[in-house]
């Protein structure tokens, strides 16, 4: 019967080892997930502050969120996303909206569009894309400063027909060998401004307004 006892002991040891391993893996996962969440949040905050620098507001933009419904046509988003409010004291001075250009050359181009209370653009940043390296990827600020041409633009600057690449009668530069990508970002930005304008009473509402 010693061999039965030995088997029983071995089974107990294996079960104990498996339990300890599972706990260790669980703790490792939680620790890794926490680190990943922290890094994602830090990157997100950095992008928001590129659009509205610290001197333009006194709130933590990354924490001042509102929900944007899925399938919001003007923003091009398919799933529910978050937008951000930018405040100075009790005044909402701007918003940062999620926008997706569905007509990129290689698929969706996701961006953040900052719009001030007066309807002017504070900044635009492309946060995800699959555009061709060396061509369409110039929408990324790390590749070129093309995206900065949106700064201070509005629905009146330029007029509606100016929101296109120069090749098609607009005021924005196209890329050599790539017209589809910049045009997609241009139109997505314009639509985001239109969304902000149409929903200004809600987006820029203060606590005093809602009281």
Locations of regions flagged by a protein language model:
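Flexible, solvent-exposed loop/hinge segments and secondary-structure transition points
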Residues: 1-211
